[in-house]
């Protein structure tokens, strides 16, 4: 698993499971809104009145409408664990802008 997917996949999965409304900003400035229906290493399916498949390379930012509770592995190099535990960590992700980068992973439905 790559470093990026150790943060990206749990974030998208939490949005999907909790059916959180999100605003997705594309690199060309267009704003899409909906819920994350599914995702894989290359795209995200957004559900609103219709389903839209959006390629991740076109996404600049994903902003959740509410805080999201996220679970991820502790080997994440971007997370500092004060206890240096090798178990799962839980963080709250707030509606702050989060940049999405390409990753490797399987489809999540």
Curated annotation (Swiss-Prot):
It comes from the Bacteria. Keywords: RNA-binding, Stress response. Residues 77-109 are annotated as: Disordered. SUPFAM superfamilies: Sm-like ribonucleoproteins. InterPro entries: Hfq, LSM_dom_sf, Sm. Residues 9-68 form the Sm domain. GO terms for biological process: regulation of DNA-templated transcription; regulation of RNA stability; regulation of translation, ncRNA-mediated. GO terms for molecular function: RNA binding. The keyword RNA-binding applies. The keyword RNA-binding applies. GO terms for cellular component: cytosol. RNA chaperone that binds small regulatory RNA (sRNAs) and mRNAs to facilitate mRNA translational regulation in response to envelope stress, environmental stress and changes in metabolite concentrations. Also binds with high specificity to tRNAs. Belongs to the Hfq family. PANTHER family: RNA-BINDING PROTEIN HFQ. Homohexamer. This is RNA-binding protein Hfq.
